[in-house]
């Protein structure tokens, strides 16, 4: 859905983003038909990956209202319906195959979906960095806001376990599930001692 709509759009407003490769894929194909307005506090990010037709350097708290105050209210129900239709097509073509059992092995998408079902998609999701991060983001599914903690563009392995501890301390009434790979987990594995000593009930799913 997002990829299709990205190719259809004629105006792309980028607010405080650096267009990293996990967002753009091949830069030449990203929003190929769109004019780009890039709002960013760091001038070094302007035009670094995606050329900007209009560049606005500064705090978006001040710059974004200059755009939004000029926008007229419109009915986007048809656009949203088209987006949802794309979601359904993607589910049938890609996601269904990834989350259902495969003979002889357990795929990452299948494991993520099984954990999501166990927690009724209501847990706080924390990820380390790697393929499990991508699979968790795609196949976990969410029902509530403020439910994802991930390093995003920082891309720092070892982020997951300390972040999961922090998430549980910040939301003690919610289950916290960490998806990690063996490399990232080992980088901060000493925090298992913190979990044991402080009795912090974080669930860890190791996907190798």
Task: Give the predicted meaning of each segment.
Residues 1-84:
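Glycine-rich, acidic loop regions that bind phosphate or pyrophosphate groups
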Residues 173-194, 207:
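DG-centered beta-turn motif at the end of beta-strands
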Residues 87-167:
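Active-site diphosphate/adenylate-binding microenvironment
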Residues 17-20, 130-132, 183:
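Short glycine-rich anion-binding loops that position phosphate/pyrophosphate groups of nucleotides
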Residues 3-8, 198-208:
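Thiamine diphosphate
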Residues 1-37, 143-174, 188-190:
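Glycine-rich, anion-gripping cofactor-binding loops and their flanking helix/strand elements
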Residues 15, 39, 151, 179, ...:
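Generic beta-sheet signal
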């Amino acid at each position: 859905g997002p990829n299709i709509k990205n190719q259809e759009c004629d105006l792309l407003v980028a607010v405080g983003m650096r267009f990293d490769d996990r967002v753009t894929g091949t830069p030449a194909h990203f929003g190929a038909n769109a004019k780009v307005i890039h709002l960013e506090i760091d001038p070094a990010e302007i035009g670094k990956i995606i050329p900007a037709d209009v560049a606005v350097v500064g705090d978006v708290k001040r710059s974004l209202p200059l755009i939004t105050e000029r926008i007229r209210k419109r009915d986007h129900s048809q656009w949203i319906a088209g987006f949802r239709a794309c979601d359904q097509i993607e589910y049938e073509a890609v996601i269904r195959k990834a989350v259902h059992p495969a003979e002889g092995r357990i795929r990452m998408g299948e494991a993520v979906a099984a954990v999501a079902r166990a927690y009724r998609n209501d847990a706080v999701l924390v990820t380390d960095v790697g393929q499990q991060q991508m699979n968790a983001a795609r196949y976990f599914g969410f029902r509530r806001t403020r439910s994802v903690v991930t390093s995003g563009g920082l891309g720092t392995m070892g982020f997951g376990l300390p972040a999961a501890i922090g998430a549980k301390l910040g939301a003690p009434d919610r289950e916290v599930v960490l998806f990690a790979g063996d490399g990232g987990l080992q980088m901060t594995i000493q925090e298992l001692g913190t979990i044991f000593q402080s009795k912090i009930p974080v669930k860890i799913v190791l996907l190798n």
